Amino acid sequence: MANTKVADVVTETLHVAGVKRIYGVVGDSLNGITDSLRRRGDIDWIHVRHEESAAFAAGAEAHLTGELAVCAGSCGPGNLHLINGLFDCHRSRVPVLAIAAHIPSAEIGRGYFQETHPESLFRECSHYCELVSSPEQLPGVLESAIRAAVGLRGVAVVIIPGDVALRESNAKPAAGASMALRPPVVQPAAADVDALAQLLNDSGKVTLLCGRGCAGAHDPLVKLAEALKAPIVHAFGGKEYVEYDNPYDVGMTGLIGFSSGYHAMLNCDTLLMLGTDFPYRQFYPADAKIAQVDVRPENLGRRARLDLGMVGDVSATIGALLPKLKARTDRAYLDACLAHYRKAREGLDELPPASRDASPFTHNTWPSWSARQRRTMRFSRSTWARRRSGPRVISP
């Protein structure tokens, strides 16, 4: 790629990585990037009215596709506006790359117009955050950022001064295969699976608490609940992955949850936490044994005292666990929890609109409508333009 610019290396690398669009607001420090996109024509620039929206849009794309999404902001307040959306992306563990343009490199550290220190500001909401100071540095930093975002599931930030983006570069992007990472599957240790099976086989009433980490594990979860005759409670982050087509689900718990979810956790002998960092300590049972499975070791025991903690992918863990469980026939506890759930839902199922295209804003059923819309993906501009209290009416 002789006689090309650093910005061209950026856009070519993103193209090789499979990026189809970049969300952002144009600015002079981003001119190199946007001009390169214009000349290429194979990556769309999605212009938004505020950089915060760009970060949230990239997060939504990454969440729905599971693939890398990209947003960009110009120097100073431009990229600072990304931060709220990037925190959401990072906490939701979706792969997002943020390109933060910076002031001219010769002016860094001299109190220049709109100068900030983005390498410090974005550190808390990213797995990777680095400043590019030279054309030679760019390829390695950008490739590392992409691998961090995809492999670690979260945000990576690359900071590029506007003048650096316009410099010439002879660098070549990495081959696509080296960046096309798939999320790793963490297999639990065999000894941990044996210990968990022993704990569950020796337990009476078991409840499953499921979170965002149960993505892709719906069918194994249902099989586990059937084997244990256990009710499934879901945290808000697990709602879309757990609740649908699930005869064992007894509702969401938490500050906006059902009493049935709280009841199922409070009255169990053993609580099995699967892929959740459910934050509300007051909702955990005081006397039950608690086991936790999570791919992130730092989550283990962070919210409640554990009798057993293990690192593993939820689906892989259930697959290894099921053959070791004793078959159960007693449904008394499960049926009691399901009855409580039906009682808690009385009157609610009649509230959602009969039509998928009906507005939710005249009904007090926003969570139900929102969950259904996410599954059907039937969004429209007019739908999202309305406020929760109803459509905005402008008097003549």
Swiss-Prot record:
Superkingdom of origin: Bacteria
UniProt xrefs under InterPro entries: DHS-like_NAD/FAD-binding_dom, POXB-like, THDP-binding, Thiamin_PyroP_enz_cen_dom, Thiamin_PyroP_enz_TPP-bd_dom, TPP_PYR_POXB-like
Molecular functions (GO terms): magnesium ion binding; thiamine pyrophosphate binding
A Pfam family annotated for this UniProt entry: TPP_enzyme_M
Protein name: Uncharacterized 42.6 kDa protein in isoamylase 3'region
UniProt organism field: Pseudomonas amyloderamosa
